[in-house]
Design a protein with these regions (language model features):
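Ampiphathic alpha-helical segments that act as solvent-exposed interaction surfaces
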Residues: 79-145
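Acidic/proline-rich low-complexity IDRs
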Residues: 13, 44, 51, 65-68, ...
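Residue-identity detector for threonine
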Residues: 12, 39, 49, 61, ...
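Amphipathic, interaction-prone secondary-structure segments
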Residues: 30-86
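Charge-rich, low-complexity N-terminal segments
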Residues: 1-44
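Acidic-enriched, low-complexity/disordered segments with a strong bias for Aspartate over Glutamate
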Residues: 6, 16, 28, 59, ...
């Protein structure tokens, strides 16, 4: 049980790093090159022509007893829940599936399929780099902030 709680804290820390919870404000927000959206189980970073989604699947499976984290890179605009479908749906250009490290001996709490391990900061940086790479493939997307 303690490990599941530790993993949930790591997920929350990653989501807070990538897309902090919004505070209600009276003024209208100005558009930025990358919009950040939180979902109940993840977040979406949306640029003009590229996006990155992070989704946490906490239910245990035989291969992932502590759950799985999916990082997906998209070309286009990802439809948000409740929004009408887009004429041109976004397409997946890359995916990274990570598992929590059981009993980590250091700060690394995530392991990719290729064995690469990440702590929260390095995984957030990797996510932003993946989004920047996809945005660079379409210069109209603008820089990652």
């Amino acid at each position: 049980m303690k490990e599941k709680n530790d993993v949930q804290r790591a997920v929350t820390a990653l989501l807070d790093e990538l897309a902090p919870e919004r505070v209600l404000k009276r003024a209208e927000r100005l558009p930025v090159p990358v919009e950040q959206y939180r979902t109940p189980s993840g977040c979406v970073l949306q640029a003009a022509t590229a996006a990155l989604s992070v989704s946490w699947f906490p239910d245990p499976t035989a291969d992932a007893p502590l759950g799985e984290l999916h990082v997906i890179v998209w070309r286009g605009v990802v439809s948000r829940r409740g929004a009408p479908p887009r004429r041109e749906p976004a397409t997946v250009t890359g995916e990274l599936v990570l598992l929590p490290v059981e009993h980590p001996s250091d700060a690394s709490v995530w392991r990719a399929g290729d064995g690469t391990t990440y702590d929260t900061d390095s995984l957030a940086a990797r996510c932003l780099a993946l989004l920047a790479e996809q945005m660079a493939a379409d210069p109209a997307a603008g820089p990652v902030k």
